[in-house]
Regions:
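Membrane-embedded transmembrane alpha-helical bundles that form the catalytic cores
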Residues: 1-153
Length: 153
């Protein structure tokens, strides 16, 4: 609606989604999903946290630096959506996934050996979409409603 309205007024808006449901991993998903927010977070949160962690030498390992920056970045994304538990848990969930994927990419010989094979891309897409859908479920707030219903019994 906003894109159409702005186009009618002659204002060009940036593309905000680029076929995110074709993503074969979570990094790919976040470069395609909500592009303006993802880019802003990458430039102003992830990069700055990463540089600060490297400069202050909080961790001796570059991989730990990146995983920490992913956690902070995705938590910031959760807080950006709101202060409800579901949004914060959603950000934390994606932070854990992004950090875990970073470790998997860097450390897994299986990944390095198979990442370009078609069967692996299909499997990776399937796993990624399931993880994203779990994230959407968390984002919806439904898990907390279900938990409250169970606790009231």
């Amino acid at each position: 609606m906003a894109v159409v309205s702005s186009n009618i007024l002659g204002i060009q808006t940036p593309m905000n989604f680029n076929k995110p449901f074709l993503s074969v991993d979570l990094k790919d998903f976040w470069t395609r999903w909500h592009i303006t927010l993802s880019t802003w977070l990458r430039d102003f949160v992830f990069s700055r946290v990463l540089m600060q962690v490297i400069r202050k030498k909080w961790f001796k390992n570059r991989l730990y630096n990146a995983t920490y920056a992913y956690m902070v970045n995705m938590l910031a994304m959760g807080f950006w959506h709101g202060l409800s538990v579901s949004y914060i848990v959603y950000g934390f969930y994606h932070g854990v996934l992004m950090a875990g994927f970073e470790v998997y990419q860097k450390k897994s010989n299986f990944y390095k050996k198979n990442k370009n094979k078609n069967w692996y891309k299909l499997l990776s897409w399937f796993v990624t979409m399931n993880l994203v859908m779990i994230g959407f479920f968390i984002f919806s707030g439904e898990p907390y409603k279900i938990l409250l219903t169970i606790l009231k019994r």
